[in-house]
Amino acid sequence: MVKKKIAISCGDIQGIGLELILKSHKEVSVLCEPLYLIHSELLGRANQLLTNAYEVKPLNAIAINSPLPSFNSSTIGKVSAQSGAYSFESFRKACELADDKEVDSICTMPINKLAWQQAQIPFVGHTDFLKQRYKEHQIIMMLGCPKLFVGLFSDHVPLRAVSQLIQVKALVQFLLAFQKSTQAQIIQVCGFNPHAGEEGLFGEEDEKILKAIQESNQTLGFECFLGPLPADSAFAPNKRQITPFYVSMSHDVGLAPLKALYFDESINVSLNAPILRASTDHGTAFDIAYQNKANNKSYLNAIKYLSQRL
């Protein structure tokens, strides 16, 4: 069977991304044909910081159109506008290759959002960039593993803004797009307010969620969406036995239980996009950068997910 070609953006080089690339290359090469979007000298420098623990020569790396950031023992673990600009250009190039069908999919290493901001990148993160690049598609952030997947109706927005986003029409569009992308037959939807609103006692948002669920099920012709469920008990073991697929109105309500249960193995997937993209479900981990402590399970699971897609 022909291996899938996967473009791998480098993420913020001051974090654990390059350690993950170097320590996982042999396993990744069994699963796919990786193409690393980074200057090869930066990989060599990363290996030196890791006491030359890994083999660099076999890696297929292509230089990107960006100045090399400062990168040495005094810069690692620190926010840098240079590194932010470099990580963005690596990601942008990966998307370009996927658009041009030169690769089958892309896998992204973690970036530092503050570094992007300091580099004056006008996007909060990977998903925000994809939403702007592919405006005609409703890009959905889904995180998880086969035991539990959570789709986020809102992602990197202030919690105070989520209430205004919960509108029946927008939520119906989201629910139907999520079901189409996952092909899940049962999806549990978390409520927004305590006790899922207690029939309107604690706010009107959950009444809107209920109406969106009813309209979505009617459109599908079967009872796919269940809820809104009180979020404080939605992820109880007996609930997770019903289905691994959930929808959360806000970022932390869905991701707190996911990361408590499956932090090391979860991945981040961009659904409903014209290109296939997956990522690690963790950040740059500046505090352990270049200490040979990075856990590569999430990265390998992201590669496995991409390599198994049609």
From Swiss-Prot:
GO terms for biological process: pyridoxal phosphate biosynthetic process; pyridoxine biosynthetic process. It comes from the Bacteria. The active site is located at the dimer interface. It is found in: Cytoplasm. Belongs to the PdxA family. GO terms for molecular function: 4-hydroxythreonine-4-phosphate dehydrogenase activity; cobalt ion binding; magnesium ion binding; NAD binding; zinc ion binding. Its EC number is 1.1.1.262. Pfam families: PdxA. Its cofactor is Zn(2+); Mg(2+); Co(2+). InterPro entries: PdxA_epsilonprot, PdxA_fam. The gene is pdxA. Catalyzes the NAD(P)-dependent oxidation of 4-(phosphooxy)-L-threonine (HTP) into 2-amino-3-oxo-4-(phosphooxy)butyric acid which spontaneously decarboxylates to form 3-amino-2-oxopropyl phosphate (AHAP). One of its GO terms (cellular component) is cytoplasm. Pathway: Cofactor biosynthesis; pyridoxine 5'-phosphate biosynthesis; pyridoxine 5'-phosphate from D-erythrose 4-phosphate: step 4/5. It catalyses: 4-(phosphooxy)-L-threonine + NAD(+) = 3-amino-2-oxopropyl phosphate + CO2 + NADH. SUPFAM superfamilies: Isocitrate/Isopropylmalate dehydrogenase-like (SSF53659). It is an enzyme of class 1 (oxidoreductase). This is 4-hydroxythreonine-4-phosphate dehydrogenase. Keywords: Cobalt, Cytoplasm, Magnesium, Metal-binding, NAD, NADP, Oxidoreductase, Pyridoxine biosynthesis, Zinc. A divalent metal cation binds at H156, H195, H251. Homodimer. Substrate binds at H126, T127, K259, N268, R277. Its main location: cytoplasm. Gene3D superfamilies: Isopropylmalate Dehydrogenase (3.40.718.10).
